[in-house]
Amino acid sequence: MTITAGIDIGTGAVKTVLFRVEGDKTEWLAKRNDRIRQRDPFKLAEEAYNGLLEEAGLKASDVDYVATTGEGESLAFHTGHFYSMTTHARGAVYLNPEARAVLDIGALHGRAIRNDERGKVETYKMTSQCASGSGQFLENIARYLGIAQDEIGSLSTQADNPEVVSSICAVLAETDVINMVSRGISAPNILKGIHISMAGRLAKLLKSVGARDGVVLCTGGLALDEGLLKTLNESIQEQKMAVVAYNHPDSPYAGAIGAALWGAFRHEKLARLGQQQVAEAA
């Protein structure tokens, strides 16, 4: 039996999970998602980790492996670090075993990953454009419009005449939005227009990694934006791709989940290797 932690330090949030792994059986012990805002992400990660240990009734010495991903490599108490594309792919397959591609839509970047049934990465590609296709841009626009971030998706679905943001540059795109507001364009039509622009780029990103059919799982901070998900599937259909994008209630935790599971795998592999060396020495 292995008790493992996964800590995903992103640009906008720290996601932390605890798992108990025994063979093919995994038990999710605790989870936590903390927005960073203006706090130190590493102190926040340590606080979150200690909070999960307390919630699960564990001590730090009970944890066999602390795996980090994202920006977590500098975390003082981590055991090992895994690249984000590796952890998101593994976490996606844990959440949806049918997932053969992943769209990680984060605060600063979008990333498309093609993976196999085990969650092993086959290929990936990141957005190379400026941040107008990112979660941070969408959050800034929501703040300017005076709406809560969790209202963006539902408002977008109410649009009747969306105004598409044409600029790739975040600064110019924000100027476009300011002009739209001055022209009396409604918030739903502005948000739907932003979703259309973002979804078009994300669909092209999926196509570029060879995601031709099957299930795509959205992960990252924008995965639960239902308006973006709906628009993404519309863009996928327009580009004649035979894939369907889904999310999962725990999609934001995919990176942390994948880190924890890869950490358990590495710990068990090292344990077997150590046992083999002892046996050979005897």
UniProtKB/Swiss-Prot annotation:
PANTHER family: BIFUNCTIONAL PROTEIN [INCLUDES 2-HYDROXYACYL-COA DEHYDRATASE (N-TER) AND ITS ACTIVATOR DOMAIN (C_TERM), BIFUNCTIONAL PROTEIN [INCLUDES 2-HYDROXYACYL-COA DEHYDRATASE (N-TER) AND ITS ACTIVATOR DOMAIN (C_TERM)-RELATED. Optimum pH is 7.2-7.5. The keyword Iron applies. GO terms for molecular function: 4 iron, 4 sulfur cluster binding; ATP binding; benzoyl-CoA reductase activity; metal ion binding. [4Fe-4S] cluster binds at residues 130, 169. The keyword Lipoprotein does not apply. Pfam families: BcrAD_BadFG. Heterotetramer composed of A, B, C, and D subunits. InterPro entries: ATPase_BadF, ATPase_NBD, Benzoyl_CoA_Rdtase_D, CoA_E_activase_dom, Dehydratase_Activator_Redct. Its EC number is 1.3.7.8, 1.3.99.n1. This is Benzoyl-CoA reductase subunit D. It comes from Thauera aromatica. The gene is bcrD. It is an enzyme of class 1 (oxidoreductase). It catalyses: cyclohexa-1,5-diene-1-carbonyl-CoA + oxidized 2[4Fe-4S]-[ferredoxin] + 2 ADP + 2 phosphate = reduced 2[4Fe-4S]-[ferredoxin] + benzoyl-CoA + 2 ATP + 2 H2O; 3-hydroxybenzoyl-CoA + AH2 + 2 ATP + 2 H2O = 3-hydroxycyclohexa-1,5-diene-1-carbonyl-CoA + A + 2 ADP + 2 phosphate + 2 H(+). Keywords: 4Fe-4S, Aromatic hydrocarbons catabolism, ATP-binding, Iron, Iron-sulfur, Metal-binding, Nucleotide-binding, Oxidoreductase. The iron-sulfur cluster may be a [4Fe-4S] cluster. Its cofactor is [4Fe-4S] cluster. Catalyzes the anaerobic reduction of benzoyl-CoA and 3-hydroxybenzoyl-CoA to form cyclohexa-1,5-diene-1-carbonyl-CoA and 3-hydroxycyclohexa-1,5-diene-1-carbonyl-CoA, respectively. The enzyme also reduces other benzoyl-CoA analogs with small substituents at the aromatic ring.
